[in-house]
């Protein structure tokens, strides 16, 4: 009886898996800090239609983002959320903070299309949110902590 051969498929799958793992879900542009990218993706004091708001994000990442949430408050208010008590994030890090109450927000969900013609449905709601916060980097506002990731809408 001949020994079993692994063949090329497991190696190919491994290489493809490694390639996919290198592509972040929401790749930050190189010329922005994490906080600046957070602001671009999620802070929208005056509500705007998903089509135009998501077009602004797509021009940086050059693909249609599946889901995005916009917080309708100034960056300074979101940064204030970073001063609330630390809680665990979805990834179990302890640098998350929950907003003090429900806030106006818009969720944009991809329905069809390919970049640059992405189509979204929008959902408006008032809900608390959780953000991950880190110390500011050079070029960030001078808050003790700045938001860098929208972890969850509660």
From Swiss-Prot:
SUPFAM superfamilies linked: RNase A-like
Main localization category: secreted
A GO molecular function held by the record: nucleic acid binding
Disulfide bonds listed in the record: 64-118, 82-133, 89-96
Organism: Miopithecus talapoin
Residues the record marks as active site: 42, 149
Compartment(s) of residence: Secreted
GO BP term, pick one: defense response to Gram-negative bacterium
Enzyme class: hydrolase
Entry's EC annotation: 3.1.27.-
Cleavable signal peptide: 1-27
Homology family: Belongs to the pancreatic ribonuclease family.
Lineage, highest ranks first: Eukaryota, Metazoa, Chordata, Craniata, Vertebrata
Domain of life: Eukaryota
Name this protein carries in UniProt: Ribonuclease 8
InterPro entries: RNaseA (IPR001427), RNaseA-like_dom_sf (IPR036816), RNaseA_AS (IPR023411), RNaseA_domain (IPR023412)
């Amino acid at each position: 009886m001949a020994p079993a051969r692994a063949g090329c498929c497991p190696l190919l799958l491994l290489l493809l898996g490694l390639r996919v793992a290198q592509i972040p879900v929401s790749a930050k542009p190189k010329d922005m800090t994490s906080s600046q990218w957070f602001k671009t993706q999620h802070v929208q004091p005056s509500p705007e239609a998903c089509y135009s708001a998501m077009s602004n994000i797509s021009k940086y990442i050059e693909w249609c983002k599946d889901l995005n949430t916009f917080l309708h408050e100034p960056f300074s208010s979101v940064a204030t959320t970073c001063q609330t008590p630390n809680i665990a994030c979805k990834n179990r890090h302890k640098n998350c903070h929950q907003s003090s109450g429900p806030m106006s927000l818009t969720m944009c969900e991809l329905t069809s299309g390919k970049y640059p013609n992405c189509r979204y449905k929008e959902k408006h709601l008032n809900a608390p949110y959780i953000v991950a916060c880190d110390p500011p980097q050079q070029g960030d506002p001078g808050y003790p902590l700045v938001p860098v990731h929208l972890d969850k809408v509660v």
